[in-house]
Every structure is written in C-alpha cells, then in structure tokens.
Amino acid sequence: MRKAIFPGTFDPFTIGHYSVVERALTFMDEIIIGIGINENKNTYFPIEKREEMIRNLYKDNPRIKVMSYDCLTIDFAQQVEAQFIVRGIRTVKDFEYEETIADINRKLAGIETILLFTEPELTCVSSTIVRELLTYNKDISQFIPEGMEIN
C-alpha cells in the first residue's frame, strides 16, 4: 500500500492544497494530511478548527486522514508508516527549499519526497494571501475548496 503524508500548517487549507491532494490520490492509496503544530508560529485559526475544516472537506473519502503533529515531519512520517512525503511547489524558491529538505529526509529515514508543481492558475494562491483577505473581510471563496466552511 502506497501511503504518503501531505504536511503543512494549512492556515487555512486552500484550493492549491486541495489540488495537490487530489493529484496525489491518483498514485497513492492513502494520504494523511498532517497539520504541523509550531508553537513559534502565530496562526489565524486554532489547530482544532483547521483539523475540523479539512476533516469535513474529506469526510466521504476513506483514503484521506487528517492528523496533527508536533514533531519533525520526518518523525511523523515514520510514526504513521508513510513511505512518501508529498509537497506542492509554486516557485523556484519553493523548489530549492523543498529539494534540500527532501535530500535530508532521504538520508535520515529513506523516505522519498514527491514534488507536485502547482497549476499555473493557482501559483498566486497561498494561505498567507487568504489570511490577509480574511483580515479585511474580503470574499475568499475562489481561493478555498468548494464545500469547505470557514467561520
């Protein structure tokens, strides 16, 4: 069984994240969306709310699980017995960073990282932008997956 984690803060989960998960499902049997807890990061939504939003989005898909974790991503991958880490790439800067982390993860644990490039129309979408729009009470519906409720 091919199992992957898709790690991130997901504050909030965007259509870009959704696209990565949907594309990864074409070659993975199970994907665990791992919501990393970083005490040094100020988040817009509490961890419980992020878990709830994503879990509700995938409630009818038994191949998707949602979990939070507060350790190194590679340790989380080993804990859940994932063979792969899936990451989304929007820019060259993202690629350079993820390539380095992928090399370290392979050396430390033998876990491969699969990099999926964002579709061109989604490269401008980020959780940071969505949070900024939320701060100013703007409509974010075009930037989050259909059916995901943010309130």
Swiss-Prot record:
- Catalytic activity reported: (R)-4'-phosphopantetheine + ATP + H(+) = 3'-dephospho-CoA + diphosphate
Q: In which pathway does it act?
A: Cofactor biosynthesis; coenzyme A biosynthesis; CoA from (R)-pantothenate: step 4/5
Main location per the UniProt record: cytoplasm
The organism sits in which domain of life? Bacteria
Q: Where does ATP bind?
A: T9, F10, H17, G88, I89, R90, E98, L122, T123, C124, V125, S126, S127, T128
Name the residues that bind substrate.
T9, K41, T73, R87
Record-level Gene Ontology MF annotations = ATP binding; pantetheine-phosphate adenylyltransferase activity
Q: Which Pfam families match?
A: CTP_transf_like (PF01467)
InterPro entries, alphabetically?
A: Cyt_trans-like, PPAT, Rossmann-like_a/b/a_fold
The name of this protein is: Phosphopantetheine adenylyltransferase
Task: Provide the species name.
Answer: Bacteroides thetaiotaomicron (strain ATCC 29148 / DSM 2079 / JCM 5827 / CCUG 10774 / NCTC 10582 / VPI-5482 / E50)
Organismal lineage: Bacteria, Pseudomonadati, Bacteroidota, Bacteroidia, Bacteroidales
